[in-house]
Structure formats: structure tokens, C-alpha cells
């Protein structure tokens, strides 16, 4: 959350005011107070809802893989690590041979702090294989997705939030796409993801 306007601002601390002149922006941490860790009885804990969502059934924000901000255009020419003239990926590629997101490119880490990160492929596979998945559709509210119940009985909800296709949402209420922190290979333009 941020506020932007060039003004003087009065900051209060310990009952004393200090005027700071010509502030051009103020950024407030997005703490997502509603987000909690859910222990499903797996190797890692899982978030109670998607990034940017206030409830488990809400879609939240959409992110391009390796980008840490939601945006309006998800076309290749707007991708952070795409060079349009050569049509090549500039990071996580054959040159650097990186296949796993660095913390600086992990939306969960940047938005929520160092104790959060996007799951690895192995962690996503564990979620799929060791949990019970049950499709849920609420006709009244219109939300749908999977209740994912862990071996210990705790559960999370993964909404069928679809994905972004260019600047338009695609397949919301029908499919879910969830990133892992890994690319298929450094020779690929594809990241490993959960699809349902």
C-alpha cells in the first residue's frame, strides 16, 4: 500500500511531532494480517489464502513467474526477464543455468517477508500426493476450487482462480494455476506449476 503526493508530512513519535518536507511517497507494509500458516502435516506449512486475497476463497493477485508485483499486462513483451528483440529470457536461462527462484524474484518473500516463499516442485508434489482433494462449488457465492486436506486433518482452500492471458483473466471458476519456484529447465520458457 502506498500514498503518493508531494507534500510536507508531520510524523509523531513519543508525543513529539517532526515535520518532514517535500515527501514524494510513503509506503506502508502490506502485512496481510489475515494470512496464517496452516500445518497440513507435510514438510512445510501452507498459506491460508493466496497473495493479495483476504479470504481463502478469494482469488488474490496474479503474478508472472519471477515477478513480485501484480500488473495489468501479462504479455511476453511486458515480462521482466524477456528481451523482445532477441526473444530470449534474460534470467533463469541457458547462460546463468538458474532453475530456482532467487528470493528477490519470489513474490511471497518480497510481499510477506523472509519466512515466506513460493513452494518448490517437491513441496507441490507432496501436496498433491499426500493430501485429499475435494472439489467444492458454492452456487450462492459463485466461488469454487479444491479443499485440500492434509494427513493431520487440517485443510486449505485453493480457488479456481484461472490465470491471466495478456490483460484478461482466463478460466476463472474453472481452472487453477499455481506456480512453483522452479523452471522446467534453464532451456525452457516454462515454469513448473500446479494445474487443475
Where are these predicted regions, by residue range?
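Structured surface patches comprising rigid loops and adjacent beta-strands/short helices at the edges
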Residues: 16-28
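Bacterial Sec-dependent N-terminal signal peptides
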Residues: 1-6
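Acidic/polar residues in short coil/turn loops that connect beta-strands
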Residues: 13-14, 152
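Short domain-boundary/entry signatures in modular proteins, especially
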Residues: 27-35
Amino acid at each position: 500500500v502506498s500514498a503518493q503526493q508531494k507534500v510536507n508530512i508531520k510524523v509523531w513519535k513519543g508525543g513529539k511531532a517532526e515535520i518532514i518536507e517535500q515527501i514524494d511517497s510513503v509506503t506502508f507494509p502490506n502485512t496481510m494480517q489475515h494470512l496464517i500458516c496452516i500445518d497440513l502435516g507435510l514438510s512445510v506449512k501452507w498459506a491460508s489464502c493466496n497473495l493479495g486475497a483476504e479470504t481463502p476463497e478469494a482469488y488474490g493477485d496474479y503474478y508472472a513467474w519471477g515477478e513480485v508485483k501484480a500488473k495489468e499486462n501479462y504479455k511476453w513483451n511486458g515480462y521482466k526477464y524477456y528481451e523482445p528483440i532477441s526473444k530470449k529470457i534474460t534470467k533463469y536461462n541457458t547462460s546463468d543455468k538458474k532453475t530456482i527462484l532467487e528470493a528477490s524474484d519470489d513474490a511471497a518473500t518480497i510481499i510477506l517477508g523472509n519466512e515466506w516463499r513460493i513452494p518448490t516442485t517437491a513441496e507441490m508434489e507432496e501436496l498433491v500426493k499426500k493430501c485429499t482433494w475435494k472439489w467444492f462449488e458454492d452456487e450462492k457465492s459463485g466461488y469454487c476450487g479444491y479443499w485440500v486436506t492434509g494427513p493431520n486433518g487440517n485443510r486449505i482452500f485453493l480457488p479456481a482462480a484461472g490465470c491471466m492471458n495478456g490483460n484478461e483473466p482466463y478460466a476463472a471458476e474453472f481452472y487453477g494455476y499455481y506456480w512453483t519456484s522452479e523452471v522446467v529447465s534453464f532451456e525452457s520458457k516454462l515454469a513448473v506449476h500446479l494445474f487443475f
